Curated annotation (Swiss-Prot):
The organism's place on the tree of life at top rank: Eukaryota
Tissue specificity remark: Expressed in parts of the adult male brain associated with the courtship song and steps of the male courtship. Also expressed in the larval and pupal male mushroom body and optic lobe. Expressed in pupal female optic lobe.
Gene Ontology terms: cellular component: nucleus
Protein name: Sex determination protein fruitless
Residue spans of biased composition, Low complexity class: 387-420, 464-475, 790-814
Source organism of the structure: Drosophila melanogaster (Fruit fly)
GO biological process: aggressive behavior; axon midline choice point recognition; central nervous system development; central nervous system neuron development; copulation; dendrite morphogenesis; male courtship behavior; male courtship behavior, orientation prior to leg tapping and wing vibration
Encoding gene per record: fru
Length: 955
């Protein structure tokens, strides 16, 4: 990334200056490492309010950007650098200000810099290029880069600083080679996939190596540095570190040199951490931001300790009270009341962070901006380090008379007046910079958010099932970034079973990991380990959550194998079903379609009537014509739904049987067998009393079945009303003009056509509740298609050939004996998921017999009924015999009994097992569902008018 600042332009040789040779106080700090390393610097960041230079900071001048040179100065003096060609003018601060005001600055940002940097570093690691360290463990060696290891682990940084060697070899004891490879992947890429079994050891190794992002190492690292600085400051001759600086090198020259060098190294480290935090800000989630901001506060405290403000650093880090010398990480304030206030503030911060993800994002960006601005000020003014961390919201309000600044940048009454003055001077600038930062954050999010994260919520829901929820708080983050330095534990697809969520599961975002939670609480000034009560054991908690998920999955699988189903629902044998068997199960759905578990995933399906009877045994025997051998085909149709070959065979056998005559009367036998066999599903159906002459002709009253179902009263009323309507229709039609005898059988019993299984000629084999009303109208308006009965064209009655505007149909004329008549019953219901209308074909024998024409007339009636029933078939499926619901899953999942696949959309999966029954009338392509076929026609054959598809032929 490239960036410019007025300090850089005002002093072009600032980057090449050597160590200072004079002790004159600086009027204004120059750009310390800021012109490089992060994507944007604003020229007004340090322009005002820094003129209050204190005398004991006179010798501190960090112009060189090379951290390694600064840190190695402890060991060896730096090589002499050539002096700048032109000396600086004495009025350089004023010159800088004027130059910056006159010259317009341009901010050049590299949007995908973190991604590019990560990719290049990973490539270098894989190619072992430019490596300068070798790690040896378990007899294997792996090469890496000291810079990357030092940036990701203070442990390695200490090793490399203490052992100055161009290519050291580090032997790691008790570290597995695979773990070291995974740790390197995490350091270079920012993420790594680790198996559940090896996760505890991996995290333990990361903790021992102090890998940032996997352990709470920032607090420990800076605390140890502050301890060393405190000890060295306490061992100075005067007992006060700042006095050495105030008095020059005095009588303690060696101590002052050592202090200055250590302070320089600390300062450069803080700069680097802040630069890293600024660089990764665009690709970090909110959980990272909170922990990084807390680390920035710790860095500020460390710098304060380096400057000699030991009390300020101790209070900020929760190390010790100003008077007591013993370490107390739990209570870092001056009094117990202050500690309690800090803990309460930390808990409130956690609650606020989990309250709203959107609000948290905006507030987090504001806090991070304020924090970064303050941290830059801290780096340049070492006495200003007593400000608390904005993100943790814990203010040490105890009786520290040294430093007591508020989160709102208003300083309370204290003795450090210079800090409050600078705070007031910079408040206006911070407000302006905060506005600019907010706008840049928005732009950066729009420019760096990958396309995958902007996809639909459906994909996010699909992906969310593979993300294990490790959040100890209930905060879902709305911003989805590809990088996440906090350990983002991923597992194989395990359904989410626990954890309260503030948003829906579709958010699918990254969560606050317990590690970031403990980091922010530990680093929240004042209330270190006490505040960690909300995240008692971050690592073990996350592992226990994963263990609970795995246990829940095992229990769920155990329950799946021991689901108690009613005997009627259990298919025979080993559930090895073919397409025909699946279609058999699919057709057995009408009377059990009310599954209490359907409403979760199938809300988009139509809530249809449960009395859609495809294979139900509810019949009426009001008419003598009903006693027909066609009832024998009930079972055959249940076995061979949608199978044209089988249907044709049944038709031929049936016609052959009818032509053979009735040597033995099969009607009574079949009816007796029917009454002797208890029906599979009983419904209480009470029909209206039939017409007197029909009652005399039929010789049997209404059959009343006792219902064992759940919705008996409602269904009985509904069926009774429909039966009464059918009876009235029959009564009206009985007074019509005389018909052919088989017309009588067609017209007199629309109830049977609707409620009994259709005859063999109906290939689609469909019936529904909606078909009753439609059949009534179609019968009344002459949709029975009398030409199917081999009448001459003049024999059709005009009163029955008129068409209804609501139920149009095309009629095919049978042109003589031996021809095949086709009845096209159009469905004009306009449903998006309508199944095809059926075509009833009958092989007519050359000698027209009454039996064949009788079956043909019944087939015509069923064809009219099927026109409406076709709309309901695709959506009215009984899933209880096809799927087993898995308990304890969110979203609700189901296991298919045929293929054992676990799905969430049962309707879609059930259609996969159905035969390809819908054929495009234009190109002949077959589809499982009619709506898919219609969509195909509208796209592929758009030149054909849409009205064609409401009258197309079911091939």
């Amino acid at each position: 990334m490239m960036a410019t600042s007025q300090d850089y332009f005002g002093n072009p040789y600032a980057l090449f200056r050597g160590p200072p040779t004079t002790l004159r106080p600086r009027e204004s700090p120059l750009g310390v490492g800021h012109p490089h390393g992060h994507g944007h610097l604003h020229s007004h960041a340090h322009a005002h309010g820094h003129g209050h230079a204190h005398s004991h900071y006179a010798a501190l001048d960090l112009q060189t950007p090379h951290k390694r040179n600064i840190e190695t100065d402890v060991r060896a003096p730096p090589p002499p650098l050539p002096p700048p060609p032109l000396p600086l003018p004495p009025a350089s601060p004023r010159y800088n200000t004027d130059q910056g005001a006159m010259d317009q600055q341009f901010c050049l940002r590299w949007n995908n810099h973190p991604t590019n940097l990560t990719g290049v570093l990973t490539s270098l690691l894989q190619r072992e290029a430019l490596c300068d360290v070798t790690l040896a463990c378990e007899g294997e060696t792996v090469k890496a880069h000291q810079t990357i290891l030092s940036a990701c682990s203070p442990y390695f940084e200490t090793i490399f600083l203490q052992n100055q060697h161009p290519h050291p070899i580090i032997y790691l004891k008790d570290v597995r080679y695979s773990e070291m490879r995974s740790l390197l992947d995490f350091m270079y890429k920012g993420e790594v996939n680790v198996g559940q079994s090896s996760l505890p050891m991996f995290l333990k190794t990361a903790e021992s190596l102090q890998v940032r992002g996997l352990t709470d190492n920032n607090n420990l690292n800076y605390r140890s540095d502050c301890d060393k600085l405190r000890d060295s400051a306490a061992s100075s001759p005067t007992g006060r570190g700042p006095s050495n600086y105030t008095g020059g090198l005095g009588g303690a020259g060696g101590v002052a040199d050592a202090m200055r060098e250590s302070r320089d190294s600390l300062r450069s480290r803080c700069e680097r951490d802040l630069r890293d935090e600024l660089t990764q800000r665009s690709s970090s989630s909110m959980s990272e931001r909170s922990s990084a901001a807390a680390a920035a506060a710790a860095a500020a405290a460390a710098v304060a300790a380096a400057g000699g403000n030991v009390n300020a650093a101790a209070v900020a880090l929760g190390l010790t009270t100003p008077t007591g010398g013993e370490r107390s990480p739990s209570v870092g304030s001056a009094s117990a009341a202050a500690a309690a206030a800090a803990v309460a503030a930390a808990v409130a911060a956690a609650a606020n962070r989990s309250a709203s993800a959107d609000g948290c994002s905006d507030r987090g960006s504001e806090r991070g901006t304020l924090e970064r601005t303050d941290s830059r000020d801290d780096l340049l003014q070492l006495d200003y380090s007593n400000k608390d961390n904005n993100n943790s919201n814990s203010s040490s309000t105890g009786g520290n008379n040294n430093n007591n600044n508020n989160n709102n940048n208003n300083s309370s009454s204290n003795n450090n007046n210079s800090s409050s003055n600078r705070e007031r001077n910079n408040s206006g600038e911070r407000e302006r910079e905060r506005e600019r930062e907010r706008e840049r954050d928005r732009d950066r999010e729009l420019s760096t958010t990958p396309v995958e994260q902007l996809s639909s919520s459906k994909r996010r829901r699909k992906n969310s099932s593979s993300n294990c929820d490790n959040s100890l708080s209930s905060s879902h983050q709305d911003r989805h970034y590809p990088q996440d330095s906090q350990a983002n534990f991923k597992s194989s697809p395990v359904p989410k079973t626990g954890g309260s969520t503030s948003e829906s599961e579709d958010a699918g975002g990254r969560h606050d990991s317990p590690l970031s939670m403990t980091t922010s609480v530990h680093l929240g000034g004042g209330g270190g380990n006490v505040g960690a009560a909300s995240a008692l054991s971050g690592l073990s908690q996350s592992l226990s959550i994963k263990q609970e998920l795995m246990d829940a999955q095992q229990q769920q699988q155990h329950r799946e194998h021991h689901v108690a189903l009613p005997p009627d629902y259990l298919p025979s044998a080993a559930l090895k079903l073919h397409a025909e068997d699946m279609s058999t199960l699919l057709t057995q759905h009408a009377l059990q379609a009310a599954d209490a578990r359907d409403e979760h995933n199938d809300a988009k399906q139509l809530q249809l009537d449960q009395t859609d009877n495809i294979d139900g045994r509810v019949k009426c025997f009001n008419i003598k014509h009903d006693r027909h051998p066609d009832r024998e085909l009930d079972r055959n149709h249940r076995e061979h739904d949608d199978d044209p070959g089988v249907i044709e065979e049944v038709v031929v056998d049936h016609v052959r049987e009818m032509e053979a005559g009735n040597e033995h009367d099969p009607e009574e036998m079949k009816e007796a067998a029917y009454h002797a066999t208890p029906p599979k599903y009983r419904r209480a159906v009470v029909y209206a009393p039939p017409h007197p002459d029909e009652e005399a002709a039929s010789g049997s009253g209404s059959d009343i079945y006792v219902d064992g179902g759940y919705n008996c009263e409602y269904k009985c009323k509904e069926l009774n009303m429909r039966a009464i309507r059918c009876s009235r229709q029959q009564h009206m039609m009985s007074h019509y003009s005389p018909h052919h005898p088989h017309h009588r059988s067609l017209i007199d019993c629309p109830a049977e056509a609707a409620y009994s299984p259709p005859v063999a000629n109906n290939q689609a084999y469909l019936a529904s509740n909606g078909a009753v009303q439609q059949l009534d109208l179609s019968t009344y308006h002459g949709h029975a298609n009398h030409q199917l009965h081999q009448h001459p064209p003049s024999a059709t009655h005009p009163s029955h050939s008129q068409s209804s505007p609501h139920y149009p149909s095309a009629s095919g004329a049978g042109a003589g004996a031996g021809s095949v008549s086709v009845s096209i019953a159009g469905s004009a219901s306009g449903s998006a998921t309508s199944a095809p209308a059926s075509v009833a074909t009958s092989a007519v024998s050359p000698q027209p017999s009454s039996s064949s024409t009788g079956s043909t007339s019944s087939a015509a009636a069923v064809a009219a009924a099927a026109a409406a029933a076709a709309n309901r078939r695709d959506h009215n499926i009984d899933y209880s015999t096809l799927f087993v619901q898995l308990s304890g899953t969110l979203p609700t999942l189901y296991r298919c009994v045929s293929c054992n696949k676990i799905v969430s959309n049962r309707w879609h999966h059930a259609n996969i097992h159905r035969p390809q029954s819908h054929e495009c009338p234009v190109c002949g392509q077959k589809f499982t569902r009619r709506d898919n076929m219609k969509a195909h026609c509208k796209i592929k054959h758009a030149d054909i008018k849409d009205r064609f598809f409401s009258h197309y032929v079911h091939m």
